[in-house]
C-alpha cells in the first residue's frame, strides 16, 4: 500500500475518536492540521480522492495488522462496513481479493472481531446475488452456522444469524448450503425454498434461540 495512504489511514483512525470540544477556530485550521500530523503528502492523497477500493484495502490491512490495536481495528471495521453498504463496493470484494481475509476474521480470537466480520458479510450479501454467490464459493456458510450455534458471545451469534439470513434469502445455492450444515434437529436433507420468507424466518428464529452450552 502507498505510504501516504497508510499514513492517512492511521491519521483517520487516530482522529476519529478525538473530542471536538477543543477544536480551534477557523483561522487556526492550518496550524491544527499540522499539529495533528497531516502532512502535505497526506492531504494530497486525501484531496486527490483515494478511491473506495483503496480505503477498503487499507482497512483490511489494518484488520490483519499486528501493529494495530483492537480499538483501532474496530474503527477500521466500522469504516469498512460503511463502505460495503454500496453494492458496487460489495461486488468489488472479490476482484480486490478481500473475501478470503474477511471470511478468515470469522474465526478471530476476539469476539468483537468475529461479530464485525459477520456484520460486514451480512451487509455485503444483502439483496446482492453476486455477493451471495461469493459467500458460497468461499465456504463461509458453514462457518457462520457454527458461529450462530456455538459462539459464546451472544452479540456475535446474533450477527452470524443476520449474515445467514441475508445470504440465503432468494438465493437457492446459499440456502441449500445452509440446510446441509444445520445442526441435528433442523431441516437437514429437506428442500427449503429460498424464496419462501416464512420458511427462512422459521430457520433464523430457531438459530437465534439455539441453546449454547455455558462452556462453549
UniProtKB/Swiss-Prot annotation:
GO biological process: cytoplasm protein quality control by the ubiquitin-proteasome system; regulation of translation
Annotated PANTHER family: HSP70-BINDING PROTEIN 1, PROTEIN FOLDING REGULATOR
The protein's name: Hsp70 nucleotide exchange factor fes1
GO cellular component: cytosol; endoplasmic reticulum
Bias-annotated ranges (Polar residues): 16-33
Family, similarity comment: Belongs to the FES1 family.
Listed GO MF terms: adenyl-nucleotide exchange factor activity
Localization, UniProt: Cytoplasm
Amino acid at each position: 500500500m502507498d505510504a501516504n495512504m497508510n499514513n492517512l489511514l492511521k491519521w483517520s483512525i487516530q482522529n476519529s475518536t478525538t473530542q471536538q470540544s477543543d477544536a480551534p477556530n477557523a483561522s487556526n485550521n492550518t496550524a491544527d492540521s499540522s499539529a495533528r500530523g497531516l502532512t502535505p503528502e497526506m492531504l494530497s492523497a486525501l484531496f486527490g480522492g483515494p478511491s473506495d477500493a483503496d480505503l477498503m484495502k487499507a482497512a483490511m490491512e489494518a484488520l490483519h495488522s499486528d501493529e494495530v490495536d483492537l480499538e483501532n481495528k474496530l474503527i477500521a471495521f466500522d469504516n469498512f462496513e460503511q463502505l460495503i453498504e454500496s453494492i458496487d463496493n460489495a461486488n468489488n470484494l472479490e476482484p480486490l481479493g478481500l473475501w478470503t481475509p474477511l471470511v478468515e476474521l470469522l474465526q478471530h480470537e476476539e469476539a468483537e472481531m468475529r461479530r464485525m466480520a459477520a456484520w460486514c458479510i451480512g451487509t455485503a450479501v444483502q439483496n446482492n446475488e453476486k455477493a451471495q454467490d461469493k459467500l458460497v464459493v468461499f465456504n463461509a456458510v458453514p462457518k457462520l452456522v457454527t458461529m450462530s450455534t456455538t459462539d459464546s458471545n451472544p452479540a456475535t451469534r446474533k450477527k452470524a444469524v443476520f449474515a445467514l439470513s441475508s445470504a440465503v434469502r432468494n438465493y437457492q445455492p446459499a440456502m441449500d448450503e445452509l440446510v446441509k450444515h444445520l445442526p441435528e434437529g433442523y431441516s437437514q436433507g429437506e428442500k427449503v425454498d429460498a424464496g419462501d420468507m416464512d420458511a427462512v424466518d422459521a430457520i433464523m428464529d430457531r438459530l437465534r434461540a439455539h441453546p449454547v452450552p455455558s462452556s462453549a
